[in-house]
Swiss-Prot record:
It comes from Archaeoglobus fulgidus (strain ATCC 49558 / DSM 4304 / JCM 9628 / NBRC 100126 / VC-16). Keywords: Cytoplasm, One-carbon metabolism, Oxidoreductase. One of its GO terms (molecular function) is coenzyme F420-dependent N5,N10-methenyltetrahydromethanopterin reductase activity. Disulfide bonds: none annotated. Pathway: Metabolic intermediate metabolism; lactate oxidation. InterPro entries: F420-G6PD/mer (IPR050564), Luciferase-like_dom (IPR011251), Luciferase-like_sf (IPR036661), MeH4methanopterin_reductase (IPR019946). It catalyses: 5-methyl-5,6,7,8-tetrahydromethanopterin + oxidized coenzyme F420-(gamma-L-Glu)(n) + H(+) = 5,10-methylenetetrahydromethanopterin + reduced coenzyme F420-(gamma-L-Glu)(n). Belongs to the mer family. This is 5,10-methylenetetrahydromethanopterin reductase. It holds the Pfam family Bac_luciferase. One of its GO terms (biological process) is one-carbon metabolic process. It is found in: Cytoplasm.
């Protein structure tokens, strides 16, 4: 099992550098930095991390082909690959409709746009002159002035068609899920995409991009995950909620609690609205032994990399060290 860790660049650069170096020293293989317009620029932060780390692979988790051209993405991730000595990975997904609406971008044809963008980025990073007459993107001989080399591309996916696309075109898939049932459902579409491309599953990285919270005290770990889990529950599509047997009343209670938190500041009500069942479904939370048990279940469902996403734990530093000391050595 490979291990990744996600960070949001909502902190100062030196704080992010500290946590990523701590993760590297703790045995993590990958760090994924989120890419949102309202946070610090992902490639600026990745440049610092590339210079200050030695072994950890690093990249955006995830960027998108709407607010930045594939040509600029290829140049940016190619630069990170050069600076880091070949450690760059590119996470790219279709993005978030609500966020795009806030910045005046129309979210349309995500499958088509993703396919074209990934095909173009791969050609550019391999040093090719790109002639591409797509429905979305049209390139007429564009070429980077340097050759970054082969950079693994991971595609963020949830729905059946995007999962198939990720397996067909990508080196890995990033799936926002923490429960083995979600990966059992995804397996059929991943296998279909791999078969279409004539690729082996052994050469493909299936990533559980999970909410994780670890502490020696089980209750502290699980309570730290409640707010994050509330947002996941509120944003999950009906198919996912039905898959896990969550009642409409329970989900609506979480949504109402979040609304009260935003309007009245009642975040305690949000934590109370999240059931233990929801924590089990939408996060990997508990003691190191609890987390190991869940990761073993995910491995049986085809997962080959687990990403520790927010909140990581009640104390981020201690939780990273705990994962490195008591979880990673037992699963690698």
């Amino acid at each position: 099992m490979k291990f990744g860790i996600e960070f949001v660049p909502d902190m100062k650069y030196y704080e992010l550098e500290y946590y990523v170096k701590l993760a590297e020293d703790s045995g993590f293989d990958y760090t994924w930095i989120t890419d949102h317009y309202n946070n610090r620029n992902v490639y600026s932060m990745l440049t610092i991390l590339a210079l200050k780390t030695r072994t950890i692979k690093l990249g955006p988790g995830v960027t998108n082909p709407y607010h930045i051209s594939p040509a600029l993405t290829a140049s940016a991730i190619g630069t990170i690959n050069e600076i880091s000595g070949g450690r760059a990975v590119l996470g790219i997904g279709a993005g978030d409709k609500v966020t795009f609406e806030r910045i005046g971008i129309t979210w349309e044809k995500p499958l088509k746009r993703m396919r074209e963008a990934v095909e173009i980025i791969r050609q550019l990073t391999e040093g090719k002159a790109v002639k591409y007459d797509g429905e979305i993107f049209k390139f007429n001989g564009a070429k980077l002035g340097f050759k970054p080399g082969s950079i693994p591309i991971y595609i963020g996916a949830q729905g059946p068609k995007m999962l198939q696309l990720a397996a067909e075109l990508g080196d890995g898939v990033l799936i926002n899920a923490s429960h083995p049932k979600d990966f059992e459902v995804a397996k059929e579409n991943i296998d279909a995409g791999l078969a279409k491309a004539g690729k082996s599953r052994d050469a493909f990285d299936t990533v559980a991009y999970a909410s994780m919270s670890v502490d020696k005290d089980r209750d502290k770990a699980r309570n730290a995950a409640r707010i994050v889990v509330a947002f996941i529950v509120a944003g999950s599509p009906p198919t996912v909620l039905e898959r896990h047997g969550l009642s409409e009343d329970a989900v609506n209670a979480v949504r109402e609690a979040l609304n009260n938190a935003f309007t009245k500041g009642d975040w305690g009500g949000v934590a109370k609205s999240v059931t233990d069942e929801m924590i089990d479904i939408f996060s990997i939370s508990g003691t190191p032994d609890d987390v190991i048990e869940r990761i073993n279940e995910l491995s049986k469902a085809g997962v080959t990399q687990v990403v520790a996403g927010s909140p990581i734990g009640p104390d981020k530093k201690k939780s990273i060290q705990l994962i490195g000391k008591e979880i990673i050595p037992k699963l690698k």
